[in-house]
Amino acid sequence: KLDELESLLLDVVDGIFQNQAELDAYPHLSQAGVGDLRFVDTNDDGLLNGDDRTNIGSPIPTFLYGINLGLDFKGFDFSVDFQGQTGNKIYNAKETVRPDLYNFEQHVFNRWKGEGSSEVEPRATAGGYNFQPSTRFIQDGSFFRLRNVTLGYTLPTGMSDRIKMTSARLYVRGTNVFTLTDFTGYSPEVASNSSIENGIDNSTYPVSSIYSVGLNLTF
């Protein structure tokens, strides 16, 4: 739930109910069972409701950056372009519509199977309680990407003159070569059609990696 454009307001997950005694001793919603997520009663009133939701961070990056480098040497030219961002949170909403029962995500293999088996992934269920909005689906949106890299070679003037051209340049180029991120969605550059859904990833289409070879000829 978005409280303001700058904040994500969610229930806070604090592990998994490992046994019935633990479930009985802690505030929980009526549909919770052993192996389900344990939510924090942040105001200590003995109830779990909207008053327990907590501002867990902003979907807006605190820092955006880019790095551009270029080098020319004896006919060779090299350029590289990096970009990145840090300081933002992403709500990975695509995982809320892929219940563990269908094994769409690999983390289902680490699910709770019995007491002590997991403190992170709840038992497999077909949606419901464990998929309500919470910090379970919050991830760091920071990333570092090699956006473009190009290596080219321009023929010496004497050689291009002999083939009756002003210049000839051969190059190879890579676009979106790699992205370093802890985000498990398709792309940390989350797109939204609504300003109130900023930072909510509903399966943003991933950026494509493109590799090309080209030849620039000037007559």
Locate the predicted segments by residue.
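Outer-membrane beta-barrel pore domains and translocons
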Residues: 72, 83-85, 173-177, 218
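Extracytoplasmic gating/loop element in the C-terminal half of outer-membrane beta-barrel translocons
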Residues: 1-36, 85-169, 173-175
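Flexible, surface-exposed loop regions and adjacent strand-edge segments
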Residues: 95-104, 182-195
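Acidic, glycine-anchored loop motifs typical of Ca2+
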Residues: 15, 33, 41-52
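Repeated loop/turn-to-beta-strand initiation elements of outer-membrane beta-barrel proteins
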Residues: 75-79, 158-159
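Outer-membrane beta-barrel "beta-signal"
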Residues: 153, 207-219
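Membrane-embedded beta-strand positions of outer-membrane beta-barrel proteins
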Residues: 80, 170-172, 215
